[in-house]
Amino acid sequence: MTPEHLPIDQYDAQLAEKTERLQSMMAPFAAPAPEVFRSPVSHYRMRAEFRLWHDGDDLYHIIFDQETRSRIRVDSFPAASELINALMPRMIAGIRDNRTLRHKLFQIDYLTTRSQQAVVSLLYHRALDDAWREEATRLRDALRADGFDVHFIGRATKTKIMLDQDYIDERLPVAGTEMIYRQVENSFTQPNAAMNIHMLEWALDVTQGSKGDLLELYCGNGNFSLALARNFNRVLATEIAKPSVAAAQYNIAANHIDNVQIIRMAAEEFTQAMNGVREFNRLQGIDLKSYQCETIFVDPPRSGLDQETVKMVQAYPHILYISCNPQTLCENLDTLSQTHRVERLALFDQFPYTHHMECGVLLTRR
């Protein structure tokens, strides 16, 4: 595979290989056959980051080969959304001959939505000034005049310049309901929007008929919490990053959801609060003991859950676990399977044409 040519004709074979590999990994836990969710074969990534290469008078996007670290020129990127592909040549054309915008520019980040909004971040190895703001505004306005709904951000050491805003609002159809999600630049969002819809709808399906409340650790912008709220009496969710908490609060209001409570604290702190080990001022007015959380949702980083968190989640009758690394999921299941059984298993092809697998399991207490 090259950045400008996807092996679309090999997609089915690669997905079959992933399915077989996941089944083999999950066999020791008596898991059912995985439900497999296909990705679009192109234009599936809603965000992308590129280095900029200055080659004499020329300027172009590059990425680095993961094995050789050699640079690869990228003029189009079919893995990315059509909007990113439309913006890439327009950004180069607008910057190449503009000394103010080009000087010491080393990276461009694109974040887009299915609703055709974009945030473009320009990263520099120099201080940014009013001249930069003026030229960036001129380029942004030219793109808007051509129909692009785009926002610009300039970044340098300890500097972030927003020309107007640093977010865009995504709209996802989830099981018959349109969900609005504010996505903030430089904060985590699911990269494959089509796969995100599949994950949300699968999570809704496996939690149908749930009793009690839902607890989610590290909820980000509320991606899963808000979609799942319709299946539970109440949802209690924790998140540590301020921009994500702010986005989650906006999303609660935008979606007219009244049964989700976001708490800004780490999972370890939350465990201490639930167990009465410590009191936290930020929990004033929130009666944790009134929550009857029978289901816990976790979507940990590639490293999986640490042993303390594994012990904590074992206390819940139902565990919904989304994993971006089946290897660490299996390590966690070595412990979790002692108390819980795997009821449902799903494979989400979040990253086509790579070895990466995203999967989901629903665990129920034995």
From Swiss-Prot:
Record: active site: C324, E358
Pfam families: tRNA_U5-meth_tr
Record EC number: 2.1.1.-, 2.1.1.35
The keyword Nucleotide-binding belongs to this UniProt entry's keyword annotation: no
PROSITE patterns: SAM_MT_RNA_M5U, TRMA_1, TRMA_2
Annotated function: Dual-specificity methyltransferase that catalyzes the formation of 5-methyluridine at position 54 (m5U54) in all tRNAs, and that of position 341 (m5U341) in tmRNA (transfer-mRNA).
Family in the record: Belongs to the class I-like SAM-binding methyltransferase superfamily. RNA M5U methyltransferase family. TrmA subfamily.
Protein name as annotated: tRNA/tmRNA (uracil-C(5))-methyltransferase
